[in-house]
């Protein structure tokens, strides 16, 4: 082997070694960043458990800044914003979450909830249905309940009734589903069925806000509860 060939071979080997080292360092940095992001996310959950939303928001934003490709962090931040009464801000994060992971069923459900709170009923229905199509949805009973309410607002009463009944079949103690079913019956002038639905909603938790609302509905229908 000539001296020149030997030099080129040495340089080639050195290049490979440097490349491998750089790749390993990049992988190590990426792993450290994931751990940092996860630590920030765990802090956010602790803040939420302690009912400190400001700390949770800051920690979630930190997690996203470190790992912007996590659909989980985006979705969780959206949920916190939704609970703080900011569906407009939450919606941006839910959209990003489903963009990062189109199969993230709960994020589709949360996006539907944000759209519903913004009274964008048609879009909410589409998001709820997308969530229900996916096998990973963790709360199908709530998604069906919310879908039924959205259909009620769109005056699609027959489908709303079917959807709410299905939600009740999944969770017979879902108070809001009975209440919303009562609203559907009122809209269709099915007074006796409406009374029965409102009675059931009230019996499940009479002192809750939904229970009190059910009592008001019963009084409006000529019954004292």
Predicted regions and their residues:
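Terminal, low-structured helical/coil segments at or just beyond the last alpha-helical repeat
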Residues: 21-34, 187-225
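Structural marker of alpha-solenoid helical repeat scaffolds
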Residues: 32, 66, 100, 134-136, ...
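Residue-level recognition of tetratricopeptide repeat
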Residues: 36, 70, 104, 138-140, ...
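Canonical tetratricopeptide repeat
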Residues: 42, 76, 110, 146, ...
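TPR alpha-solenoid repeat register
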Residues: 73, 107, 141-143, 177, ...
């Amino acid at each position: 082997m000539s001296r020149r060939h030997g030099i080129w071979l040495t340089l080639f080997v050195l290049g490979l070694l440097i490349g491998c080292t750089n790749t390993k360092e990049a992988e190590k940095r990426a792993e450290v960043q994931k751990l940092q992001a996860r630590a920030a996310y765990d802090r956010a959950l602790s803040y939420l458990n302690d009912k400190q939303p400001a700390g949770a928001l800051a920690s979630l934003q930190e997690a996203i800044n470190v790992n912007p490709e996590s659909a989980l962090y985006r979705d969780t931040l959206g949920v916190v914003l939704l609970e703080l009464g900011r569906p407009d801000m939450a919606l941006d994060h839910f959209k990003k979450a489903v963009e990062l992971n189109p199969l993230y069923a709960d994020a589709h459900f949360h996006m539907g909830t944000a759209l519903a709170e913004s009274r964008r009923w048609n879009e909410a229905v589409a998001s709820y249905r997308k969530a229900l199509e996916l096998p990973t949805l963790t709360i199908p009973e709530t998604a069906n309940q919310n879908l039924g309410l959205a259909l009620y607002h769109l005056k699609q009463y027959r489908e709303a009734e079917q959807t709410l009944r299905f939600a009740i079949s999944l969770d017979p103690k879902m108070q809001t589903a009975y209440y919303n079913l009562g609203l559907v019956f009122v809209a269709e002038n099915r007074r006796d069925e409406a009374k029965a639905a409102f009675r059931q909603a009230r019996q499940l938790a009479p002192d809750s806000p939904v229970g009190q609302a059910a009592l008001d509905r019963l009084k409006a229908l000529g019954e004292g509860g």
